[in-house]
Structure formats: C-alpha cells, structure tokens
Swiss-Prot record:
Name listed for the protein in its UniProt record: UDP-N-acetylmuramoyl-L-alanyl-D-glutamate--2,6-diaminopimelate ligase
EC number: 6.3.2.13
GO function terms (MF aspect): ATP binding; magnesium ion binding; UDP-N-acetylmuramoylalanyl-D-glutamate-2,6-diaminopimelate ligase activity
Database matches in Gene3D superfamilies: Mur ligase, C-terminal domain (3.90.190.20), Mur-like, catalytic domain (3.40.1190.10), MurE/MurF, N-terminal domain (3.40.1390.10)
SUPFAM superfamilies: MurD-like peptide ligases, catalytic domain, MurD-like peptide ligases, peptide-binding domain, MurE/MurF N-terminal domain
A Pfam family of this chain: Mur_ligase
Annotated organism of origin: Pseudomonas putida (strain ATCC 47054 / DSM 6125 / CFBP 8728 / NCIMB 11950 / KT2440)
Catalytic activity: UDP-N-acetyl-alpha-D-muramoyl-L-alanyl-D-glutamate + meso-2,6-diaminopimelate + ATP = UDP-N-acetyl-alpha-D-muramoyl-L-alanyl-gamma-D-glutamyl-meso-2,6-diaminopimelate + ADP + phosphate + H(+)
Enzyme class at the top of the EC tree: ligase
Protein family: Belongs to the MurCDEF family. MurE subfamily.
Cofactor (UniProt): Mg(2+)
Length: 496
C-alpha cells in the first residue's frame, strides 16, 4: 500500500502523519486518508469535513476562499487558496507522477474520441505495447473496462487510474480528454506526449456558452508543454486552425513538437486517403503519405470511421511505429461497443446502434449507412434533458433530411419533462406530421423494428453503449442493444 508523509504534499502542515490515500468524497474516507474539501457544482466538500474526520481522516486540505467555521480537532486542517486548480498536481505527486512513465495519448473532439482511443489501444496491444484506456466506456485495458460516469474522471481519479494502469503493465495510455476536463483542470498536471483532435461541432454549449469558448477549451490540449506530436484533422475547420497556428510558431518549437495531419479531402495532409471503396465488410482505401502509397483496410463502416482510423494510424506513427507495421494490424481493429454496432441483417432488418447525440454525429452516421439501405433508412433519436436546448431542432433537421422515416423518443430526460423536449425538437422538422413521436424508448424501438422491412436499415441514435436511462435523476436499467435484440427476435415470427 502506498503511503506518503503529509509534508511531501503540504510543507506547512502542523503535523506530519502518513497519508494512505486521497479522496474528494467524505463518504469514502478511511483511516489514514487525506480528505480534499473543495466546493463543487452541487455539493461543497467543506460542509462534510466533520464527517471525514469521524471516518478517520488523517488530514484535511480545504479551499480557503469562502470557508466557514471549521470543526475543532487535533487533525491537521490545511487552508489552500485555489485548491481545485492544484488537485491534479497534488495527486500526481502522491501517485508518483505516473504520466511521466507512460506514452500518454490525449484525444479530444466532439465526436470520435472513444473510437480513436479504442483503435489506438487495440493496435498498440497487437504491436506489443500494452495500452490502457480512460474514457466514456470506462477505464482499464481493452476488453476489461470498468465503467465510470465521466468521460474524463476527476483529478484524483485520473492520477490514481494512471498509476494503477502502469502497475498493471501499461506502457501507454489512450485517454479521452473532454472540454469539461480541460476547462476544470482535471488533467492539468499530466504529461501528454500526443494530442489528437478528431473534429469540432456543436455540443456542450449549455456549459461553455458559445462555440468560441468550447473551441478555446479544446485548444488548451494543443499548447501542452510536454507534447511530442499534435495529430489534427484537416477536414475540420478547427483542425485547420490548429495546423495554421502550429505553422506560425517559432521554428525552435518544431524541434520539440511535430505535427501530423490527416484528411479524406486534402492531399496536403501527412496522411491522405483517396479511392475509398465502402462495402458491408468495411473499407479499402489508398493511403498517400511521404513514404509513398499504401493500401489501408478496415472492417469499420462509414466515411467518418475511416477518418477515425486515420487519426489512429497517425497516432501510431507519432509513437514511432513503421507505417507498414501499422497497416498489418488495421484490418483486425474493431469498433467500440455502441458505436456503429450492427445487429440483425440478412433476412431481417439491419439495426445499427450508435452513440450519435449531436447534429454532426447523426449526420455522419446516416450518410454512412445510406449505401447499406437497400430498402428504407429509418432513424430513431431523442435529446438529453438538462443539456443544450439549441441543438434539439438541429437534430430534427438532420434526421428529416437524411432518413426516409423518423421516430422521436426519449433519450435521458434527466429532470426535464420529456414532452418539453419533444416541443423543442418539433420546430426542426418541415413536415412534423410525417414524424412519429413515441414516449418510452423501449416501446419506440420495438415499434420501429416491428414495422420495418427486411431490407431496411434502422439507426438507433443517442445512447450507444449506455446500459441505463436517466429519468428524474434516477438511473434505470436500459440498453438499446438489449431492446433491439428483443425486437429483432419478435420480428422473425410474423415475417417467417
């Protein structure tokens, strides 16, 4: 068990007990722990200092600004100005600076983070470098993920997880880095080696307020002092701006950091794909690089997944793998759970479950699946409650324009009235009377699949891998994959 004298973390502490663990949650405190009491969006940890002490905390560090009366105790209570901003550094020191001992890949962007990190991790495993994962689907190693609630965990959990992965044999970690995490300093003390940008489109404006603020949060990762390489998408406006910013830097910066770009459209990119042939089995494309032309093969569906694959290939090049070595493993790489995941097909409808919950992501999924729909292309979607209301009609516009039939249902209503969410979505349709609105996601999925033809393709968008539905603040067991499997099994009987 790791322990550290308190003085190694706070030199001015009144006493110097051995610290066994760090925690932000008073309920998880055990004897010997350091409780870090900070104000949060919903709960102020400083109000729970007494609880932490009762549970055996060896010391408490708390945010000094705005602190109220503290309990009387012999346990060290350490006031710290700006504690939240220092959490990542404190945890890094406690856990032995694990990011310095790993090839740390940070992937950011509106869509594609999960796919790219999983592709990178699978490829590195196949190439002999064990790679850990931190992201939307959880933390751990590929195929053995422990689920979590946040794309990027809190600053303590991030450092602790990196340390656990290192001890578990990881030499690299592919990590999703959300705009929230960058803005809130959750990864502030990490030493990223590679920064990857997938794309930028409308999302999280309920938090950031504007696209400019959202972009500024994402851009922070590409100014990281420890970077060896930036990987950017030239098919995206933000990616082109990052590349232009890099080109304007003093040449001395380019000695320490290089830039690799990828594109399906621009021959100027470091990795440029042309002559892509898409089929039900995936894609075969010509890859144009400074090393000459190669053939890239992938089993993933869709043009946007080819872009994700290019991001992964560029990342592996940044980690000094040879291109020919990389291209030997790309045909083996699989997509993540709930990302363009296929069920059915053959003599029954093809159902595709995808996490697409932004207008841009939904557009890419529907465009990718249109060639596979030999009948009609059907789309089911909803919009999450307590999130950006402005994107709701935009989702409707995309679905109506690209699908033959649209059904709107609940996503995660959270604390919002589902009917109000429907009301926000409806104005995005030019022909709302042609659209089905069905409350109850399970019922909606069953209805859409039951009424589909065998040669139709059905997109269930928005929830992907999620195994719950959040209603009135409570998470209920629910899975699009499970509901689709049940509906496909029921579909066989009347059509047999």
């Amino acid at each position: 068990m790791m322990t550290m004298p308190l003085s190694k973390l706070f030199a001015h502490a009144s006493r110097d007990p051995l610290i066994r663990e760090l925690t932000l949650d008073s309920r998880s405190v055990r004897p010997g722990d350091l409780f870090l009491a900070v104000p949060g969006a919903k709960v102020d940890g400083r109000e729970h200092i007494a609880d932490a002490l009762a549970r055996g905390a060896a010391a408490v560090a708390y945010e000094e600004q705005g602190a109220n009366v503290l309990p009387l105790t012999d346990v060290p209570l350490i006031p710290v100005k700006g504690l939240i901003a220092q959490l990542s550094d404190i945890a890094g020191r406690f856990y032995g600076e694990p990011s310095r001992q790993l090839n740390l890949v940070g992937v950011t962007g509106t869509n594609g983070k999960t796919s790219v990190t999983q592709l990178v991790a699978q490829a590195l495993d196949l190439l002999g470098q064990r790679c850990g994962l931190i992201g939307t689907l959880g933390t751990g190693f590929y195929g053995e993920l422990q689920s979590g609630r946040l794309t990027t965990p809190d600053p303590i959990a991030v450092q602790s997880t990196l340390n656990d992965l290192k001890k578990g044999g990881a030499r690299a970690v592919a990590m999703e880095v959300s705009s929230h995490a960058l803005e809130q300093g959750r990864v502030a003390a990490l030493e990223f080696d590679i920064a990857v940008m997938t794309n930028l489109s409308r999302d999280h404006l309920d938090y950031h307020g504007s696209m400019e603020a959202y972009e500024a949060a994402k851009a922070k990762l590409f100014a990281w002092p420890s970077l060896r390489c930036q990987v950017v998408n030239l098919d995206d406006d933000f990616g082109r701006r990052l590349a232009a910013d890099f080109a304007r830097r003093p040449s001395v910066d380019h000695i320490e950091t290089r830039l690799l770009s990828y594109s399906l459209e621009s021959p100027e990119a470091s990795l440029f794909c042309r002559e892509a042939v898409f089929s039900d089995d995936g894609v075969r494309a010509t890859l144009v690089t400074a090393q000459g032309e190669r053939i890239l093969r992938s089993q993933l569906l869709g043009r946007f997944n080819l872009s994700n694959m290019l991001a992964a290939v560029a990342t592996l090049l940044a980690l000094d793998y040879a291109l020919d070595e990389i291209l030997k493993v790309t045909p083996q790489l699989q997509g993540p759970v709930g990302r363009m995941q296929r069920l059915g097909g053959g003599d029954k409808p093809l159902v595709v479950v995808d996490y697409a919950h932004t207008p841009d992501a939904l557009e890419k999924v529907l465009e990718a699946l249109r060639p596979h729909a030999h009948g009609k292309l059907l789309c089911l979607f909803g919009c999450g409650g307590d999130r950006d209301r402005g994107k709701r009609p935009l989702m409707a516009e995309v679905a109506e324009r690209l699908a033959d039939r649209v059904l709107v249902t609940d996503d995660n209503p959270r604390t919002e009235d589902p009917s109000r969410i429907f009301d926000d979505i409806r104005p995005g349709f030019t022909r709302p009377d042609d659209v089905e609105f069905v409350a109850g996601r399970g019922e909606a999925i069953a209805h859409l699949i039951a009424t589909a033809a065998a040669n139709d393709v059905i997109v269930l968008a928005g929830k992907g891998h999620e195994d719950y539905q959040e209603i009135n603040g409570e998470r209920h067991d629910f899975s699009d994959l499970t509901e689709a499997e049940k509906a496909l099994a029921a579909w066989e009987a009347p059509h047999a």
